[in-house]
C-alpha cells in the first residue's frame, strides 16, 4: 500500500523532477531558498521541505548545509542524535519510526557556499542520486560563492 501511495505521489509531483538526456537517467533537482536577510527561516524552510518530501512523499533527498561556519542543519542533526543516544525512550521511538518508514534519515553534507555545487556533484558521482538536493545558504549574498551557488540551482 505504501509503495502505491509513493508512486501515486511521484506521478503528482513528477513535473518538479527533471530527466537527463543520457539514457533517461535521473538528474537531481538542485533547490535553494535564499534571501539577503539572515534569520528569516531559510534553514527551517529547507528542513521542512526536505523532511516533507522525504518522509511523507517518498522522494529521495539530500541537504547540503553550506551556511558556514555554523552549519545549523548538521548541528541540529548532531544534537538530535546525541539526545536519542542518551535516552532509551527516544531510542525506541527513533527505531520504531525508521522501521515503519523503511528508511534512515536523509543525508546532510557540510560544505561552504563556494564548494556547495561541487559537494553535491561529488556525492552524486559516488553513486548517491537523490531526486532533490536542497542547499542551505548563508543569509547574505556577500558571502563568497553564494551567487555562483545560486546560479547552479534549478
Label the predicted regions:
Residues 1-153:
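P-loop NTP-binding core
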Amino acid at each position: 500500500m505504501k509503495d502505491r501511495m509513493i508512486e501515486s505521489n511521484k506521478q503528482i509531483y513528477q513535473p518538479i523532477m527533471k530527466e537527463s538526456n543520457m539514457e533517461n537517467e535521473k538528474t537531481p533537482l538542485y533547490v535553494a531558498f535564499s534571501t539577503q536577510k539572515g534569520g528569516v527561516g531559510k534553514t527551517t524552510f529547507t528542513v521542512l521541505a526536505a523532511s516533507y518530501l522525504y518522509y511523507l512523499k517518498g522522494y529521495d533527498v539530500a541537504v547540503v548545509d553550506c551556511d558556514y561556519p555554523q552549519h545549523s542543519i548538521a548541528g541540529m542533526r548532531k544534537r538530535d542524535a546525541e539526545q536519542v543516544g542518551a535516552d532509551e525512550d527516544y531510542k525506541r521511538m527513533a527505531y520504531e519510526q525508521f522501521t515503519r518508514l523503511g528508511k534512515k534519515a536523509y543525508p546532510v553534507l557540510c560544505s561552504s557556499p563556494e564548494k556547495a555545487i561541487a559537494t553535491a556533484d561529488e556525492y552524486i558521482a559516488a553513486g548517491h542520486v537523490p531526486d532533490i538536493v536542497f542547499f542551505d545558504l548563508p543569509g547574505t549574498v556577500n558571502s563568497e560563492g553564494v551567487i555562483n551557488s545560486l546560479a547552479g540551482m534549478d
